[in-house]
């Protein structure tokens, strides 16, 4: 009997424990619903599941079996619908009330409390105000919340010709250890006269942004980091949001870049950093390239050298620190792809697109550590941070100049049989300096520039040493300048600004003359101008460059900028003015549609002899639940052309009814929403070009892999547009041409062919 009672007691305890666990999970789910972000663990049986889950949500860390993850409400619901059973955990930012500092009595502040947002802003500005001989303060921009992306730039007042170095942190708002490390590092660089610090200030041009996601860090209040979350204010994981050389310009399938992302990309292109590091938390390891691809970086051995140096110096303080347990980890360092693959990381963008050696430093297992432990993390990382910066001074350095004038030039520095995937570097104006970190060895280094004779040198370099190799390139006489440029975006809505980037080459260019049809200003002599487009249309852009001898070259990109009226779905009717519209979901071009939507909208042409055409550039809704339907007429009583859901891009649709109208309905479910769609609205008939009216235009093969044939009659312009509306290939030909597509990522593109007989728009699929 006694044994029976004991058994009943044990069973009761087990049942109660199970019920309490269920209640705890329900309580956590309610908490996270209100917070807008879910934090959980998942156990996987097969390593292949890690990639599947990584595609569905944000994996923060994994030991190969247990995954620590974050998800926005959409991602979490999809994960559950896929059959996964996440174990919710208390959000790290809500485990305790953090100690905050309001900025008062700074003379006694010991870096053991998190600053309020206002204290952070005041501190950043005061660094420059109090130490103008070393520090300048600037802002990349102000977010909709009023919070800013703030930088301190530190040097000895003479930055020309020196390597540029970048430290950033906290692109995930709830990862605050690096935030505190960066603030304290700025303070030391501004105030210390230690010879090691003075050497860095004198020989580097240092940029530091302690917090690149302030909306995430101060999500609940400017007064506290309590409730900080990983994503930004728009529920975007900023470390999945960058262009990816393997997965395309927007691997997270969001149509437009967040301000935080675009501003950092602009900064990288403007300043051409030599080295960088981006601080995260959630693990303790240095994660080096690549994140997105199994191939090794060209400088893989160099990456192991500098990462081991960082981790080894941390181990001098504590052998258990910076030593993540993982089968692929090597004493505190790990290749990103071998850990777990992600697409759209900042690290991969900087290395591939910006010629900058950037590493990801995971500097604490705890997301928001107790602020009193910050001095400990400073001790662990201090020497390592300085050593990593000092590596920017090693390798091959020099200036590249014109052999006749001695003036600095922009040239490419490439290493034979070594460089690939963007590992080559370039020299920079105004000094013509270049900086090439590299592992010890003997290399064949080639220096080349348009209009100059290339030179190749055999250069030997040792680890942790610098070799100087100045180069003079001999100009090729009478080489004409070559104008070239690109735009930050080519498909925009009325009122948008577009930044243009000069890519011209030539001997001693002295002037740039831009013409912007339909833009304000209409002309510019700036190197990289910014233009506003206030009226709809398709506009040319022309650039004329002139060299010192007076030779000129003009490049005109016809129909380069497409400007449309913005038309978001709603209940009612719209008359398509100018036959140019960008059809968007209720969230606009950068937001998501909402839950429980039920819209019906009819779009009519301005003139009755025209018909509406819709071409989808991007499409993503919740499969089988959120549905966009299109009817050939002015109501839902008209014939149904099609209903679309999921990720497959709909074909081009043209109205055939006498009024030329299309009616759209959109219904969304009670949960899970995506960005929806982006589609151009144009017209047939009248003065507008018939988008399917070209007499002869044969495009094959479709799908294609490495090349595409276009056959037509006469002189023809063509443009190939990616899912963002960016022109990735363009050209002019007569009768026929072969277009090489080898360098383009797999995906769906829009091919526009314009000739004397009309225009043809066709969906093109590129496969790999």
Describe the role of every protein-language-model region.
Residues 404, 474-488, 564-574, 681-700:
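Residue-level detector of functionally pivotal "anchor" positions at catalytic/ligand-binding pockets or at interdomain
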Residues 3, 511-513, 691-768:
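C-terminal outer-membrane/trafficking sorting elements
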Residues 407, 415-439:
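Short, acidic Ser/Thr/Gly-rich low-complexity loop/linker segments typical of extracellular
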Residues 396-403, 471:
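A short, amphipathic beta-strand motif
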Residues 440-451:
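A short, solvent-exposed beta-strand micro-motif common in secreted/extracellular proteins
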């Amino acid at each position: 009997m006694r044994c029976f009672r004991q058994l009943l007691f044990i069973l009761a305890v087990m049942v109660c424990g199970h019920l309490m666990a269920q209640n705890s999970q329900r309580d956590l789910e309610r908490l996270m619903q209100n917070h807008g972000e879910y934090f959980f663990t998942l156990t996987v049986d097969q390593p292949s599941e890690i990639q599947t889950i990584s595609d569905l949500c944000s994996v923060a860390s994994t030991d190969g079996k247990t995954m620590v993850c974050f998800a926005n409400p959409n991602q979490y619901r999809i994960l559950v619908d896929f059959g996964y059973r996440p174990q919710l955990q208390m959000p790290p930012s809500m485990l305790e009330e953090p100690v905050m500092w309001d900025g008062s009595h700074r003379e006694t502040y010991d870096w053991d409390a998190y600053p309020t947002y206002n204290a952070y802003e005041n501190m950043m500005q005061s660094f420059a105000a109090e130490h103008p001989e070393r520090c300048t303060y600037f802002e990349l921009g102000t977010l909709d919340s009023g919070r800013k992306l703030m930088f301190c730039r530190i040097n000895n007042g003479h930055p020309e010709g020196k390597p540029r170095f970048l430290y950033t942190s906290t692109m995930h708002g709830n990862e605050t250890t690096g935030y505190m490390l960066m603030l304290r590092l700025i303070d030391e660089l501004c105030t210390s006269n230690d010879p090691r610090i003075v050497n860095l200030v004198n020989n580097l041009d240092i940029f530091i942004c302690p917090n690149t996601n302030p909306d995430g860090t101060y999500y609940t209040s400017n007064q506290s980091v309590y409730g900080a979350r990983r994503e930004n204010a728009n529920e975007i994981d900023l470390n999945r949001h960058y262009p990816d050389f393997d997965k395309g310009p927007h691997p997270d399938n969001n149509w437009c870049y967040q301000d935080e992302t675009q501003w950092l990309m602009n900064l990288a292109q403007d300043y051409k950093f030599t080295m960088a590091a981006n601080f995260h938390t959630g693990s303790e390891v240095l994660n080096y390239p690549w994140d997105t691809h199994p191939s090794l970086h060209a400088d893989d051995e160099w990456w192991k050298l500098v990462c081991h140096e960082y981790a080894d110096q941390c181990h001098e303080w504590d052998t258990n620190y910076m030593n993540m347990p993982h089968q692929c980890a090597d004493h505190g360092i790990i290749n990103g792809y071998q850990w777990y693959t992600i697409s759209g990381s900042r690290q991969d963008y900087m290395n591939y697109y910006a010629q900058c050696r950037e590493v990801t430093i995971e500097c604490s297992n705890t997301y928001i550590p107790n602020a009193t432990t910050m001095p400990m993390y400073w001790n662990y990382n201090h020497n390592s941070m300085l050593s990593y910066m000092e590596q920017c001074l090693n390798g091959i350095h020099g200036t590249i100049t014109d052999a006749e004038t001695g003036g600095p030039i922009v040239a490419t520095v490439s290493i034979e049989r070594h460089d690939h995937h963007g590992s080559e570097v370039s020299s920079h104006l105004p000094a013509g300096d270049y900086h090439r970190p590299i592992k010890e060895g003997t290399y064949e280094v080639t220096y080349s520039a348009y209009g100059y004779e290339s030179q190749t040198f055999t250069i030997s370099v040792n680890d942790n040493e610098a070799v100087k190799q100045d180069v003079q390139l001999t100009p090729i006489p009478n080489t004409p300048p070559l104008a070239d440029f690109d735009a930050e975006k080519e498909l925009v809505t009325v009122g948008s600004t577009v930044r243009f980037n000069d890519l011209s080459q030539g001997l001693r260019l002295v002037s740039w003359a831009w013409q912007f049809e339909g833009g304000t200003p209409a002309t510019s002599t700036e190197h990289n101008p910014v233009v506003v487009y206030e009226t709809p249309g398709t506009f040319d852009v022309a650039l004329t460059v002139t060299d010192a001898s007076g030779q000129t070259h003009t490049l005109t990109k016809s129909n380069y900028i497409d400007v449309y009226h913005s038309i978001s779905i709603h209940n009612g009717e719209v008359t398509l003015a100018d036959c140019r519209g960008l059809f968007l979901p209720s969230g606009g071009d950068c937001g998501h549609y909402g839950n429980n939507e039920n819209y019906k909208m009819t779009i009519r042409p301005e003139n009755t002899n025209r018909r509406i055409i819709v071409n989808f550039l991007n499409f993503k809704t919740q499969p089988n639940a959120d549905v966009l339907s299109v009817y050939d007429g002015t109501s839902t009583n008209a014939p149904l052309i099609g209903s679309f859901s999921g990720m497959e891009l709909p074909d081009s649709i043209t109205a055939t009814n006498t009024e030329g109208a299309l009616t759209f309905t959109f219904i969304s479910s009670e949960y899970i929403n995506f960005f929806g769609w982006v589609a151009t609205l144009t017209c047939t008939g009248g003065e507008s070009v018939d988008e399917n009216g070209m007499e002869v235009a044969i495009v094959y093969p479709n799908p294609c892999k490495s090349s595409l044939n276009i056959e037509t009659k006469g002189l023809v312009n063509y443009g190939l547009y990616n899912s963002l509306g960016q022109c990735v290939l363009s050209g002019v030909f007569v009768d026929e041409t072969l277009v090489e597509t080898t360098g383009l990522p797999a995906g769906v593109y829009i091919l526009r062919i314009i000739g004397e007989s009309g225009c043809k728009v066709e969906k093109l699929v590129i496969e790999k």
